[in-house]
Amino acid sequence: MHKEEELWTGNIDDFLRSCNIKAIISAPKEEEIRRCYELLQRTNQLNSSGRRLSIDKVREILQDNRYESFVLKSSDKFGDYGTVGFLIINKNGERPTVTDFVISCRVANKKIEPTLINYLANRYGGELLFNYKRTLRNGPMHAIIEELAMQPYASSDTYETYLCKHDASYPDIVDLRER
């Protein structure tokens, strides 16, 4: 992709559209739990919380009705990237809240991350809270907050929480589907 991107003379959104980026989200299956755990352990730059959950804690969350979780798979005209993301939403508060969001650097800067968060804001009635804990390495995750113009909502010793409102005008670069 990098060579083709370097040769592209149009704007980046047009280039990304030409890549035919596809993303599929679904509830994690038993055989995907280990990959979800691996993403939580290995992902630094695109990790919203910085948390390192044990595999037992991941299983516990997946069975808890207060949470909804998604795995993210992606492909484009250059290939199939497999399972590249994992996201946990706490549905128990005043608004659904993304507590953890990790995505592989293999698909960074393809607009998948903000497309997914914007989609979920719409799915949950137009608004979604997003927990973010700044670490030494996850600045790229904060860029998503800025790209979606999330507004500061609350702050604690643990997280900064942002309000994400669905933006119907967000570019349709990624073909995102839910299974």
What are the roles of these predicted feature ranges?
Residues 1, 6-23, 27-45, 78, ...:
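Conserved helicase motor core of SF1/SF2 NTP-dependent helicases
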Residues 18, 40-43, 71, 98-102, ...:
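Generic, low-specificity signal for short hydrophobic/alpha-helical stretches with a mild N-terminal bias
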Residues 28-96:
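A conserved beta-strand-loop-helix scaffold within acyl/acetyltransferase catalytic domains
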